Amino acid sequence: DAIVGLKMASGSGLTPQITAAVAMLQGTSCSAYLDPHLDFDTHDTIADQGVHQNTLFAGISELIAALEAASLLGTTTIVVMSEMGRTPKLNGNTNNAGKDHWPYTSALVLGAGVKPGVYGGTDDQLYGRGIDLATGKPQDGALPLAYDNFAAGILTLIGIDSKEWYPNVTPIQGFIV
């Protein structure tokens, strides 16, 4: 009943989506997808990137507070991620410089069942290092974390047998309590 009549206008930020997500999680839904409708793709004008990231982090804080107020934070896992990363260096010398696509990215995972920490790592050139999937710690000679290892780890974290979806993939376990 809490989401009947709720209208989410495009570009109105995360607040209406957070309200709807919490209402759905209080009901019968077991997942929700939130999209801030922001352009994080800053090939140029790098100054915009910080503004958009601050908006995103404020939204994450708002989501955490709303989940906590609804007594859902202890049973909810939050995953914030992108399909790609950005180069660690600017693509030019002007005020309009930005960052191009980069094969390494990061994810923020928090909430129920998550062991706090930093998992994975980069070398001196900022390329992804291999990791031990059991611990999430960098390990020489190991393969870098792949998307399927991460997805299998998230499934494992939320209590789903990852082998049903990724039968030949080892999930990352390091961030799981």
Residue ranges and their predicted role:
Residues D39-V177:
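Feature marks hydrolase-like catalytic cores characterized by long aromatic- and Gly/Pro-rich stretches
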Residues D1-A70:
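Anion-binding catalytic surfaces of enzymes that hydrolyze or transfer phosphate/sulfate esters
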